[in-house]
């Protein structure tokens, strides 16, 4: 059971706190000036009691007793002059360990919050998401329209396809024939003119398919592996006379 606090205890505590906080000598007159509500007799008795209890140091000077704080063994006081509870090294280390553990928890929490903040910052805003949704919706409608066109478009009949193949084959055949005819004529001219092909080309001014970057129509009548873009052993001359 805790000790009941009496008025005497309060007086002792107030006087002791005043002297310890000021940390300078006091006589009863100075205490009386600080606490006008206390009487001289009460102050003198209280100072004497504190001195006898070893809570204050005192000495008589010229028939006046001076009291001051015990410097060597006095307890540590806070800013208000109250005694600070003393703790052992073990208690302090244990308290420090607890603070360090709490610090680690707070640091982990901070890291987690920073990570969450970065993730939120990297996410699209509602406005950006709506813009992207609108763009994708527009692209989807365009693709659906193209798909519908392909689905409803009339497919080429076999007859039309055959007609197109025949036209391509005929065009290629005529192309090959004319290239061969020109090559034969060119060989005869070269044989009679005694000129080199390069010189004769400069005089006449013809251009080859390669000069004009024209590719031979593939021969679709052959397997894909045998199709060529130009005839073998053919210099692919394409006639273009100078005017």
From Swiss-Prot:
What Pfam families does its record include? LZ3wCH, TBPIP
One GO term in the molecular function aspect is: double-stranded DNA binding
InterPro entries recorded: Hop2_WH_dom, LZ3wCH, WH-like_DNA-bd_sf
Coiled-coil residues are 86-153
Keywords, ordered alphabetically: Coiled coil, DNA recombination, DNA-binding, Meiosis, Nucleus
**Which Gene3D superfamilies does the protein's record reference?**
Winged helix-like DNA-binding domain superfamily/Winged helix DNA-binding domain (1.10.10.10)
Where does this one sit in the cell? Nucleus
- This protein's source sits in the domain of life called Eukaryota
Residue ranges, compositional bias (Polar residues): 223-235
- UniProt record, GO biological process: homologous chromosome pairing at meiosis; meiotic joint molecule formation; meiotic strand invasion involved in reciprocal meiotic recombination
Reported function: Required for proper homologous pairing and efficient cross-over and intragenic recombination during meiosis.
What does UniProt give as the signal peptide span?
Answer: none
Q: What is this protein called?
A: Homologous-pairing protein 2 homolog
List cellular component terms (GO): condensed nuclear chromosome; DNA recombinase auxiliary factor complex
Family stated for the protein in its record: Belongs to the HOP2 family.
Instruction: Provide the residue span(s) of the region labelled Disordered.
Output: 217-243
């Amino acid at each position: 059971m805790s000790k009941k606090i009496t008025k005497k205890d309060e007086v002792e505590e107030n006087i002791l706190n005043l002297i310890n906080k000021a940390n300078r000598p006091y006589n009863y007159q100075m205490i009386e000036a600080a606490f006008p509500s206390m009487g001289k007799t009460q102050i003198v008795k209280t100072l004497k009691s504190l001195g006898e209890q070893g809570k204050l140091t005192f000495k008589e000077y010229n028939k006046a007793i001076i009291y001051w704080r015990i410097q060597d063994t006095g307890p540590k006081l806070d800013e208000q002059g109250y005694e600070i509870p003393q703790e052992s090294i073990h208690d302090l280390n244990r308290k420090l360990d607890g603070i360090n553990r709490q610090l680690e928890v707070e640091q982990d929490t901070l890291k987690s919050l920073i990570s969450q903040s970065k993730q939120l910052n990297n996410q699209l805003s509602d406005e950006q998401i709506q813009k992207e949704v609108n763009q994708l919706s527009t692209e989807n409608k365009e693709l659906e329209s193209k798909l519908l066109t392909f689905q409803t478009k009339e497919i080429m009949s076999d007859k039309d396809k055959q007609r197109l193949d025949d036209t391509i084959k005929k065009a290629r055949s005529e192309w090959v024939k004319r290239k061969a005819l020109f090559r034969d004529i060119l060989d005869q001219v070269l044989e009679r003119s005694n000129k080199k092909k390069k010189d004769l080309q400069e005089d006449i001014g013809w251009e080859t398919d390669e000069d004009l970057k024209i590719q031979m129509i593939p021969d679709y009548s052959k397997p894909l592996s045998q199709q060529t873009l130009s005839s073998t052993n053919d210099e692919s001359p394409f006639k273009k006379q100078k005017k």
